[in-house]
Amino acid sequence: MTTAYASRANKKQREAILHTDGPLLIIAGPGSGKTFTLVERVVYLITELHVAPEELLVVTFTEKAARELITRVSNRLNEIGVRFNLNEMYIGTFHSICLRLLEDHREFTRLKRNFTLFDEFDQQYFLYQRIWDYRKLPDYELVTGDGSSWAQSEELLKWLNKVTEEAIDPMVLAGARDREVQALSWCHTLYQMQLEEHNALDFANIQAEALRLLESRPEVLAKLRGQLKYLMVDEYQDTNTIQERILSLLMGEARNLCVVGDDDQGLYRFRGATIRNILEFPLKFPAGRCHPVTLSINYRSHPDIIDFYNRWMADGTWEVNGQRFRYAKTIKPPEDEDFHALPTVVRINAPIGDAWMEEVHAFLLRLQTSGQLSDWNQVAFLFRSVKNGHVVALAKYLEQHGIPIYSPRSNQFFDREEVRLLIGAFIFLFPQFPEVRKWDANAHLDIWDYYDENCFRPFAEQLRKPENRPLLAWAQPLIKRHGTLAQPADYAFSGLFYQLLQFPLFAQHLEEEALRGVDKGRAARNLATFSTLLNKFEYLHHISVLNPAYLDKNLRDLFNQFLRFLYDGGIGEYEDDSEYAPSGCVSFLTIHQAKGLEFPVVVVGSLEAGPRKQYTDLDAILENGYLAKPPFEPLDYTKYFDFWRLFYTAFSRAQNLLVLTSFERGGTQPAPSKYFSDRFYALPDWRSPAFQPEQMTFERVKAINLKREYSFTSHITLFENCAEQYRFFKELEFTPIRVSPMLFGTLVHQTIEDVHKIVLRGEAHRVTAKQVETWFQANYQNLAKKERVYLAPTTLKAALGHVMRYVQRESSRWDRIQEAEVDISLVKDEYILTGSVDLIRGERGTVEIVDFKSEKKPDLEKERERLQRYQRQLEVYAHLVEERTGQRVSRMHLYYTGEDSGNPYVSFEKNDKTIARTIAGFDAVVHRIERGDYGMVARPHKMCPDCDIRPYCDNKTWKFKQTP
């Protein structure tokens, strides 16, 4: 181990870094340098043991954690001068890694090309739209309950995901004696059939399909075991049964599996996680085989804060019937550091209501006037839920008194003025809405009051203002048209949305100045979210234009179902992964949200809480007879375990000052509750003379350096064509209006990819005309079903001809193919460069790059500008291939599949100087994007005719850059 490692790591960290043979359990207490240890262990494997990137698998809890790990490892390797392409590693969440396995081996799964991936809302909406299918099943209400259709779909989702995440054997369910479990079995069987019918996959089933792949295809498992030499898993205490089984399969005989976590911070039982995975990890191996390391030195918190949460855990009950459900550990500060003796754990309390909020406000002002607090973002409030009425009231009170609050998960999306005005605008544009929303004369939904009073009324009031007369003038003919629509329009709801953005009522939120405000452009982000919701709605309900035959139903579906369900469930607002504590704002976060973070000042609320039961009768039935393993933690005790772990996690986020706050309430539900009361009142009051923030030092919030990915086609070309388009659709993440996809080109590409895949597998003899047509038809059926676009028979015949011509021309040279559809990436100093190469072929020590174009070969003179852009794209790919593989690229080609009889190639010689200029230009564009420079010298009018944001741009007051 090099001196650089030794000087930075403590004894236990070094032990964890250097132990690479066999299973390793790292129990990492809060603030103990867990991420540092993970980074150094990866670097050690690469530099000292010469492990190749494709031999490493690293699982993180979030994609953000994966990006942070990639960034930190690449920076360390750069420090010591080691070139290594980290993106060859299997690194990411369980879901992303399993998805990669499925895509790499899709032919061995039930999945077909172009499958749909559901998020949680998509999954529930899918079930909601089919709830009547489930109501036909015997005893379905034992699973779904007897609530509304939406409530039943929510219950159904919960139980279906539990079956999947617990890896419960469907055959065991099918043979159940309990009526509830029989009903669940029928629901599960139906759901799996529906997923297969729609070629869909939800998040839980990503892992189930991956497990099924590994268990049913020994050749796939053997290949992965032979490839993956070292496995590392972060946050192991929050893994579930199916994830544990996947790891057990992948680790193979060498068992070089390193798991890292803290059983005291296991928070995700409600998502299927089980603490038994980390507590029983050593038992998976022969006695003495698993090497345990405990990281217990806390580099984050003041010793008094550490002592407070140590005592909190020591007071919990962790042993039941002789079995212990916690690793014994005591967190301690570094021995060689000096700390001040001022109180660092204090309380804020006052009677419930305004008095408590005033007291919290006074405390914050004391911190501010102390002169030691440099930014409000050094303060974070942590609660069980930020949707709680007391929490929402406190946030509003503080904002009204000049303290900005950042609370992206408080579900205030539908309370924001810009969202309410948008909904009001849509109601205004469809005068029939008050009548068509009713399914009978006496019908009423609670959300109609929100629409009428909170959305329509304020929008109507805005229209009375002189500055909004252009908006009224634009709307009036549309109101008339929509009220008596006789012919299909040439737009849908999303088209109206982008028209609305041209008016100052909404455009004011999109200017560069608004995005630099304290709230970091929250309103603009909310408008972007609304565009995504409309896009999703139109896709789910097959809407491409407003059609008089379906308009009334579309309005009911949008307002009575889609928006209502989103309103009831709540929508989080924008969160920037690279800035978890925005400057100028006090953070209001859930404890779960704060996991893994740290703040100089942490104020923990929700002290009126107590342990609460989190399981149902059906949970108990499944636990005691149907799970793959016997019960572990006693169900009756889980509420206490979870309660102690939750607040331990909260308390341990604090660096310099930990504050406990509670309103005071008597009666049968006292606040603070009995679980906190003694500890709470034993703390010094913040008004005590002993509390002297003037004498304290508050750290600054740590910056997070996350490298972002950039590709030539998705980023550089878009930015160069129009920086304003880039700002909208990439930076602010607006969703463009759905247009008919280029089905022809995609179909040709996918079928050629099928050909290459078989050839690379050594089965070129299978590439017959009949087989190619079979692949082609299967691809077309899947594409057409997903995109809801169909091709005429003559067009289909032409597309098949493109593929057949390619096969006939190239079949004698299949042996030159080395790789196909290669997603390649390169971690650079400032960003990650990515690309996707259609084909890499080679001979005599060099390789050539081929990019397919499903069109006729263009006129080389007339299309010179377009061909030059393609050449730059190929040069980026050549740079990626050479840097990633070390192979020399000799030539680059465009292959035009539509060329009937002539040469289908347009070829470019590789020139190192030209490539260097292209990469330098790429770097310059990325630098502009990274610093938020979207200025233009003029509008690129050739891009405007079909652009969704043209109405906005036509009315924008431009500030063009001066040409050099």
Please name every model-derived segment.
Residues 1-111, 198, 219-222, 231, ...:
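P-loop NTPase Walker
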Residues 55-151, 276-280, 727-728, 743-747:
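Conserved P-loop NTPase-based nucleic-acid remodeling module centered on helicase motor cores
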